[in-house]
Structures are given as C-alpha cells and as structure tokens.
Regions:
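Structural motif
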Residues: 107-116
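Conserved short "hinge" loops at termini or chain/domain junctions
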Residues: 1-107, 141-143, 147-167
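Mixed-charge, glycine-accented linear interaction segment located at domain edges/termini
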Residues: 125, 130-131, 146-147
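Short conserved catalytic/interaction loops centered on acidic-Pro-aromatic/His motifs
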Residues: 131-140
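Short, hydrophobic/amphipathic alpha-helical patches that form generic packing surfaces
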Residues: 60-63, 116-128
Length: 167
C-alpha cells in the first residue's frame, strides 16, 4: 500500500467509561442474586483488593483487541524487556493505519465493539470467580463480540471490484 493510500485512526477508550460500564454490569449481576454474601462480592469489583485483578484483565483485554486489529495495528517491538507492573491508564489507545477506502461507519462500529469487548472480558473474568453460573453467559457475549470485530475488519477491507469477464 502506498503512503497516500492510508489513513491513521486512533481508537481511544477512556478508562473512566470502561470502569463505569464494568461496575454497572457487576452491580446488576449482584443485585439480581438472592440476599447472601456473594451478592456483595460480585458488586464490589472495584474495591481496593479487587482492583488489581480488574486492571490486569483490562490490560489483557486491551492487548487482545490490538492483536485482533492486526494487520492494521501492528507495532514493531520497541523494547527487549516487558515487566508485569499493574498500571491503570487514563485511557487506552489503539492506533491503526487503515486503507483510504475503509468505511467511517466501520470505524464507528469497531470503536463500539472494542469498548464492549473490553468490558465483557473483565466482567466474564470477575464472574468466573464470584458467580460461575453467570460466567457462561458473558463468555458467549464475549465470543459474539469477538466474531463481530473480526467480521467488521474482514468485510471492510475495500470496495468490491468485479471483473468484466468471469474467466
């Protein structure tokens, strides 16, 4: 692809919005449970002791999304070492280089799907620990969102060109 045939797009996901949705889903899942101790465990996803797990899975979900957008998001390795320090970022940014013919609506759809994927990934992990009977529902949603992301990428690579002769 020539340089002028590409456009750079940054997908930005504010951590505060991701956390709001994650906490909201955890609250709803906990609220519909019968009154018992587990109800509060499910709803307390952002408590001090639990936030480390949330950050780790959110960072993993971000990395998975960057990988799903390959070849548009490929980054060369820029360091020879990587630590596992937990860091909650202000926002998660995915830089992608898309072909000029890539649809703006596809970019909008991808942005929404990636946001949902990151949220669902954290909620599914949290429920696998605290409410295993609901975790399967979130895993199904997660697989569905992942398929939609891949489908959006595959279907929007450019305009269809039909040859005049079939053979």
């Amino acid at each position: 692809m020539k340089e002028k045939e590409k456009i750079e797009v940054s997908f930005t996901f504010n951590t505060s919005e991701l956390l709001y949705d994650i906490k909201n889903y955890a609250y709803i899942e906990g609220n519909i449970m019968p009154d018992d101790e587990r109800k509060f465990q499910v709803r307390d996803i952002d408590e001090d002791g639990n936030i480390n797990r949330l950050i780790r899975v959110l960072n993993l979900a971000y990395a998975e999304c960057v990988e799903m957008l390959y070849p548009y998001s490929k980054d060369e390795v820029n360091t020879k070492e990587k630590d596992s320090n937990l860091e909650l970022l202000d926002c998660y940014v995915i830089d992608a280089v898309l072909p000029i013919g890539f649809s703006q609506t596809s970019v909008n759809i991808l942005s929404s799907l990636i946001h949902e994927y990151m949220v669902y990934r954290v909620v599914a992990d949290w429920l696998s620990i605290n409410k295993p009977e609901s975790q399967g529902n979130w895993e199904i949603k997660l697989v569905d969102i992942k398929d939609k992301i891949k489908s959006t990428i595959a279907n929007r690579r450019g305009p269809v060109k039909r040859r005049l002769q079939p053979f």
